[in-house]
Amino acid sequence: MAPYWIEKLGISKSELGNVLFFLLISLGIFMFLVGRWQKKLGFSKIISLGILLNAFGLFCLYWVKSPLGLLSWAFLIGMASCFVYIPALTVVQRAFLERKGLVSGIVNMVFGLSAAIIAPIFRLLLQKWGYENMILLLLGLTLGFGLLASSLIKEPKETKLMQSLRGFSLRPKEALKTSSFWLIWSIWALQGAAGISMVILSVPFGLSLGLGMKEAVFLLSSFNIANGLSRLISGFLSDMLGRKPVMGLSFLVSGLCYFLLPQGFSFAGTSLLCLGIGFAFGTLFSVSAPLVSDCFGLEHFGAIFGLVFTAYGFLAGLLGPSFSGYLLDLSGDYQYVFYYLGTFSMISSLLMAFLKKPKP
């Protein structure tokens, strides 16, 4: 949607970066709150509320005619996403304690692959149906399928096996006092910034290389496909090989891909580099959830994971999309932007080596 908003709403690249920044700020605020609210209201009710908020956001987007309206929509959609994401992630980990990486990967894969599937569909719908009709279609589908699915969510029944596998759990205040929390928080700020920036940079970067719109969108699709598939692959591998090596290696690859992007590779080579960055971004999401529950327990997982997410919401958006947009407007050169983001991935890989599970 970025090229459409740039053309029709007259927003700059830096303002486009702020769209993601406002979305991430919303995630930073509401991820923690939803993590606490779900214990009182239950998973099904929270997800249903998220679906209604998503539908209302689409209704608002139908009427958006200015950059300010677009930023308000981004904040609302970020809030709505929290009401779906956190309870879904919590309920599957509680139900499948021995395969937390795998089930977390499946949930995250659905979130990630939806972007890969919908990006080319958006382009076709935009061309054939127009912007307003496309929004109305999405609104109807969101309400219909979303409310049906949320009604099927149930609280996992407590078993003796589940009780034996839960282990110790830290409260949010206790988790905040550990170095492990702040290492994970820093990784989310840096690698989160490196990953989310590619969402807004890939298509304009492709166009700057002289690619057509179809090929430029394919760069974004490559990123999104890897972002989705890696969530399942990395989640599964983390159950077998451990969370730290899977995350550390993927972040290292992301850094190398960013450093290589400005070197003028072919279309296929550039697509592969976008794929590598997307793989690391998906790994961050899928493996971080079981990593947090491994370190701090499941009893207060939603609230603690929400606190970790403040790094992504409050800092990653500022360091990544927003500052990248300003840097690009200032220099007009993607090379500096990619070196900047690649450094974040390298630092994140290094930080993983220092992460240790807190002692009970």
Cite the ranges covered by each PLM segment.
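A late C-terminal transmembrane helix in Major Facilitator Superfamily
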Residues: 295-331
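Helix-to-loop junctions at the C-terminal end of transmembrane segments
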Residues: 30-43, 231-242, 328-329
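Hydrophobic core of transmembrane alpha-helices in multi-pass small-molecule transporters
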Residues: 57, 68-83, 189, 269-283
